[in-house]
């Protein structure tokens, strides 16, 4: 991606320059760079030190990450990260720093019943299984059969044993399994503006009309997730985009449509989290949306743009 290609999509250019105002250049500089790769060391397969030792011996240079002890930024790699024996046997997962965060915020515990409503290809599912020490149950759902194959491969490769794969439209879970899950991750399909460095094709198809279609999916998924949550249960809604229409607007929609939604605050060591918006253009959102968090690439070098809302369903 370069600045010219963004300028060629006038709708996108107008949105980003309007949204970021004085930070527009800084945002573009960061988001169009492909971030350094990061890996999550998989303790379901071996202990951390064993895995690190094997990688360091081969000449990998790794840097610790403040917010998660099993994540490392790859400063130098002698071979492609996907081409090592260690990758093949599931000792690590190549995962962006931002995408490690929704599972950490959701914090599933061993023994809980968890739903990942749009889970393929499985970075967050396999991370949650690791956090749960392969105990309890994860229902990993996706509607796209091609992506489900990748999900199944990753679950297998990473030694995940506590996960059931379902191929169902996510918006049906609330009706099929009301008040069933302790924790739910709604990592919604989105316009991916936070990942332009990795997904330059977004610039070609991004439009207001496309956002409208995505919003319909996002609304149905957040309602379905909330309905499938037990009273007292915890849900995370996340996207890798920056548009308020796909983020704060969707959480605000849930607050309008359902009683008993509490937005919770959270912090992460070493990550600069920006507060959620309470207004955007002609839209006014509920005040508690300030507790939602944005990860802005220009404030967090090496991170992609991300949005995360942590919510609790009040005990009935």
Annotated model-derived regions:
Residues 1-316:
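S-adenosylmethionine
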């Amino acid at each position: 991606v370069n600045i010219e290609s963004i300028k060629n999509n006038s709708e996108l250019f107008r949105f980003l320059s309007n949204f970021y105002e004085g930070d527009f250049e800084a945002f573009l500089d960061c988001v169009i760079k492909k971030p350094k790769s990061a890996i999550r060391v998989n303790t379901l397969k071996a202990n951390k030190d064993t895995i690190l030792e094997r990688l360091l011996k081969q000449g990998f240079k790794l840097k610790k990450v403040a917010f998660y002890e099993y994540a490392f930024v790859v400063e130098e790699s002698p071979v492609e990260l996907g081409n090592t024996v260690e990758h093949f046997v599931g000792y690590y997962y190549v995962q962006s720093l931002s995408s490690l965060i929704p599972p950490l915020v959701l914090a599933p515990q061993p023994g809980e019943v968890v739903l990942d409503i749009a889970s393929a290809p499985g970075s967050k599912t396999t991370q949650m299984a690791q956090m749960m020490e392969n105990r309890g149950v994860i229902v990993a759902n996706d509607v796209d059969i091609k992506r489900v194959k990748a999900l199944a491969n990753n679950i297998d490769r990473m030694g995940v044993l506590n996960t059931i794969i379902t191929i169902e439209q996510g918006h049906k879970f609330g009706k099929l399994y009301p008040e069933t899950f302790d924790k739910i991750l709604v990592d919604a399909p989105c316009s991916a503006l936070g990942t332009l460095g990795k997904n330059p094709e977004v610039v070609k198809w991004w439009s207001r009309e496309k956002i409208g279609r995505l919003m319909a999916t996002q609304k149905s998924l957040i309602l379905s997730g909330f309905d499938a949550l037990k009273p007292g249960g915890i849900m995370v809604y996340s996207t890798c985009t920056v548009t308020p229409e796909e983020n704060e607007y969707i959480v605000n929609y849930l607050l309008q449509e359902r009683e008993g939604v509490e937005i919770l605050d959270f912090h992460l060591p070493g990550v600069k989290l920006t507060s959620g918006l309470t207004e955007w253009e002609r839209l006014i959102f509920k005040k508690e949306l300030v507790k939602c968090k944005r990860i802005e690439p220009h404030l967090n070098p090496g991170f992609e743009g991300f949005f995360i809302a942590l919510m609790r369903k009040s005990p009935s």
